[in-house]
A protein has these predicted regions:
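N-terminal cationic and glycine-rich segments that engage phosphates or anionic surfaces
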Residues: 1-61, 67-68, 72-116, 126-133, ...
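Active-site phosphate-binding and catalytic loops of NTP-dependent enzymes
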Residues: 11-13, 121, 141-149
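A generic local structural motif
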Residues: 49-50, 140-146, 166
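Short hydrophobic alpha-helical runs that function as membrane-insertion/retention elements
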Residues: 62-65, 85-88, 157, 177-182
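Short gly/ser/thr-rich secondary-structure transition/capping motifs
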Residues: 136-143, 159
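Conserved acidic residues
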Residues: 153-154, 192
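Internal active-site segments that recognize and position negatively charged phosphoryl groups
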Residues: 154-172
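Short glycine/threonine-rich loop/turn motifs
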Residues: 166-203
Length: 203
């Protein structure tokens, strides 16, 4: 709990920006700011970590999602370290609910990468090589973090669900459990494993 305190995990949003469904996790309000109950934060963090460990132990793929600037580097680093897919740019509609199409685009990206590595781009006309190179870079930018995803994930981990609403909606629609940070402006009902913390203090 001390670690949570040191990173400022207890500071919520301004009281006027709160979601009433977060009331059970709020300890107090000071100077117009809601203060989260760190005892409950620590409890729910452990529950969420146990769920993630169980999913991983069962061989489930966990998709990490966090497009806000301060979340991008930690998400990419931790997901890569764990060998899991991630989304740190824009969430594209249908990334989960229309995964067949997304998988086709990932396959195209992999095919273009193979052609590039084989030196095919070097023997094309400059115009054609540039066209395919641009297409490859766009695919990498949009989907590069998802290259490990061969089927819909078994769990989704979201930083700031208030920003990643579409990701949570798609996961819920497919019955995929969602772990997510729950700041005081978040609707925790969209999370099977809410972690009540300040998601603006990513560490």
């Amino acid at each position: 709990m001390r670690d949570l305190l040191e990173v400022g995990a207890h500071f919520g949003h301004q009281t006027r920006r709160w979601n009433p469904k977060m009331a059970p996790f709020i300890y107090a309000q000071r100077n117009g700011i809601h203060i989260l109950d760190l005892a409950k934060s620590a409890k729910h963090l452990q529950i969420a970590l146990d769920a993630v460990r169980d999913a991983s132990a069962n061989g489930e793929t966990i998709l990490f999602v966090g497009t806000k600037k301060q979340a991008q580097a930690p998400i990419q680093e931790e997901a890569t370290r764990a060998g899991q897919p991630y989304v740190i740019k824009r969430w594209l509609g249908g990334m989960l609910t229309n995964f067949t199409t997304i998988r086709k685009r990932l396959t195209l990206m992999e095919q273009l990468e193979a052609r590039e590595q084989a030196g095919e781009f070097d023997i094309m006309s400059k115009k054609e090589a540039s066209k395919l190179g641009d297409k490859l870079e766009k695919l990498r930018g949009a989907l590069g973090g998802m290259r490990r995803l061969r089927k819909a994930p078994g769990m989704v981990f979201i930083i700031d669900p208030s920003r990643e609403t579409l990701a949570a909606i798609e996961a819920n629609k497919l019955g995929i459990p969602v772990v997510g940070t729950a700041d005081t402006n978040v609707n925790p009902d969209q999370l099977q494993y809410p972690i009540p913390v300040n998601d603006d203090a990513i560490k």
